[in-house]
Amino acid sequence: VALVLDIHHHWVNSGEYISPTDDRFARIIDSWRGVRPVIHYSVSREDILIGHPTNVQPDMDILLAGEYKKAKLRAHSDYMWNNAVNDWALEFLQYADIMVESKAKNLASVALHKYYTENKNELSKQNVRQKASSEQPIFTPLW
């Protein structure tokens, strides 16, 4: 059985932005038995995190200390509005395809793809710095 990692729901449940080089994700990749895996990606609703900076990943501990509840944070946004979270999610493209879960469906996927293509050089530089010692295979996105 091939397992699918939902990175948003993992964050909601644990407060952790899991790394694509995490051993737990490696086990998920292995469950696909040579086929390129898929992950699910969504972001908390824009109308829940009103005023949150788009260049800062939401911090679960801070949100829970405020008026936010996990049940509300679980809900999918219309678009992938947080670029810091997008940058993190796009790190997974080296290892898996990304299935966008959002209210705006294909429009959100197209917008994320546009963000990726406009920023992939900078994202690649960040990934090289972060993973200089990694020996994980690098895949080409299928977009």
Where are these predicted regions, by residue range?
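Acidic/histidine-rich catalytic cores of soluble enzymes
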Residues: 1-39
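Glycine-rich loops and low-complexity Gly/Arg-rich segments
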Residues: 2-3, 7, 64-66, 122-127
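Active-site beta-loop-alpha junctions enriched in small/polar residues
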Residues: 8-12, 39-46, 101-105
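Sequence termini and other peripheral, non-core segments
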Residues: 13, 69, 73-87, 96, ...
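Short, glycine/charged-enriched secondary-structure capping and boundary segments
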Residues: 17-19, 54, 113-115
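A short, acidic, amphipathic alpha-helical segment used as a generic capping/interface helix at domain edges
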Residues: 20-34, 47-94
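Hydrophobic beta-strand segments of well-ordered beta-sheets in folded domains
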Residues: 35-41, 95-98
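Noncatalytic linker/hinge segments flanking ATPase motor cores
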Residues: 44-51, 139-143
